[in-house]
Amino acid sequence: LINVIISKEEGTIKMERYEEIEKSIITTYRKKIWSKFIKGIKEFEMVQEGDKIAVCISGGKDSMLLAKCMQELKKHRQVNFDLVFLVMDPGYNPINRQKIINNAKLLNIPITMFESNIFEVVEKIDDHPCYVCARMRRGYLYSKAKELGCNKIALGHHFDDVIETILMGMLYSGKVETMMPKLHSQNFEGMELIRPLYLVK
């Protein structure tokens, strides 16, 4: 998805100046990315006056794109809201951890990083480790975001992820399930999850 803006070479982002990338999101890629991003924000009412949103960054291209889109949204905002860029280290090796830090710096994304022991815990689980990992990650992100005064977390899932989730459910469990563009947390009162790239293909 973000490959249209950023190319990777030996694990490090090779790129133009971040100002040019920011400009390209709303010009060169206006139709492909920006317009669909804005449509999703408005159609599903994802951002309201006074929100403090934790943009959750895994280090991958989708979450990095989300971070840049949210920065641009704030810059061109019609409502007042605040952003925090949250990176959870579930047990990365030092090289991968540093890559995330370096790439965020190159993209001018001021990250807040915190640690968890998810990888260590999941290594000991035999049944459905991916499911357990995803649930634990979500819980840690909600908890840290709430600690920082946020009322929402934003994840980088896009349209392709939505379709994949539907197909996986149909093929493996015989159920039609999908990702919602936003949902209220059942375990963290007052917290909401949003997926601003929901309509971006």
Per-segment meaning from a language model:
Residues 1-14:
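Short, positively charged and aromatic/hydrophobic N-terminal segments
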Residues 14-168, 172-180:
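ATP-dependent adenylation/nucleotidyltransferase module used to activate substrates
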Residues 178-201:
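Short, flexible loop segments at boundaries between secondary-structure elements
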